[in-house]
């Protein structure tokens, strides 16, 4: 019935045709007892398709926390200090221990240095830092925006040969006049 004329006979006659067909089929499947529950749970009754199995994830809040250290979990400071290898909690809590470093002033200069704790760092003096040298011949500090290039000591001095000569003759380029170069800081003589 690919021809449009064949379809028109159904519309013009206003006839309705009902077709009934019966198909008998037999399917034999063998499954184990463990497979039937997973296959049946994955079948969707609406579509009859097999869906992915639901993935059950365990929640961390339901699980008992695992302690990797042999410390008392009620004393958080001791647990952190054992994990990081810091000083014992007794050095911070009690005042009878002597350390080489003290935040309070003492009248006896040898009171804090008689014992040195094994956890203290050995500080060594450093050489003073020198400022980095500039690897370039020109820097932004040497450039005068009106003239183009200037001397570091006198920013209003024009270097001959950059835009031409100082008087503006020769060189092919246009150079600002010497009046503009010397008055570069005033707002009335700026180039617009």
Curated annotation (Swiss-Prot):
Q: Give the start-end ranges of region Disordered.
A: 24-65, 101-135, 163-192
* Record-given protein name: VQ motif-containing protein 22
What job does the chain carry out? May function as positive regulator of plant growth.
Q: Which gene encodes it?
A: VQ22
Any GO CC annotation of this UniProt entry: nucleus
Q: Where is the composition biased (Low complexity)?
A: 24-38, 102-114, 175-192
Ordered alphabetically, the record's keywords are: Nucleus
- In which residues does the motif VQ occur? 76-85
Q: Which organism is it from?
A: Arabidopsis thaliana
| Other remarks in the entry | Plants over-expressing VQ22 show stunted growth phenotype.
The family database entries (InterPro entries) matched by this protein are listed as: VQ (IPR008889), VQ_15/22 (IPR039609)
- Per the record, the coiled-coil ranges are none
């Amino acid at each position: 019935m690919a021809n449009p004329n064949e379809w028109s006979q159904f519309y013009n006659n206003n006839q309705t045709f009902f077709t009934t067909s019966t198909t008998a089929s037999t399917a034999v499947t063998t499954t184990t007892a463990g497979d039937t529950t997973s296959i049946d749970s994955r079948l969707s009754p609406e579509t009859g398709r097999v869906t992915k199995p639901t993935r059950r994830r365990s929640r961390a809040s339901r699980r008992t926390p695992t302690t990797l250290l042999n410390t008392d979990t009620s004393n958080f400071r001791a647990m952190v200090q054992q994990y990081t290898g810091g000083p014992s909690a007794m050095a911070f809590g009690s005042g009878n221990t002597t350390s080489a470093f003290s935040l309070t002033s003492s009248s006896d200069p040898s009171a804090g240095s008689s014992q040195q704790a094994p956890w203290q760092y050995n500080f060594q003096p450093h050489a003073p830092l020198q400022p980095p040298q500039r690897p370039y011949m020109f820097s932004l500090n040497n450039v005068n925006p009106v003239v183009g290039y200037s001397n570091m000591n006198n920013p209003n001095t024009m270097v001959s040969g950059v835009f031409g000569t100082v008087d503006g003759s020769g060189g092919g380029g246009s150079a600002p006049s010497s009046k503009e170069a010397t008055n570069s800081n005033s707002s009335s003589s700026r180039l617009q």
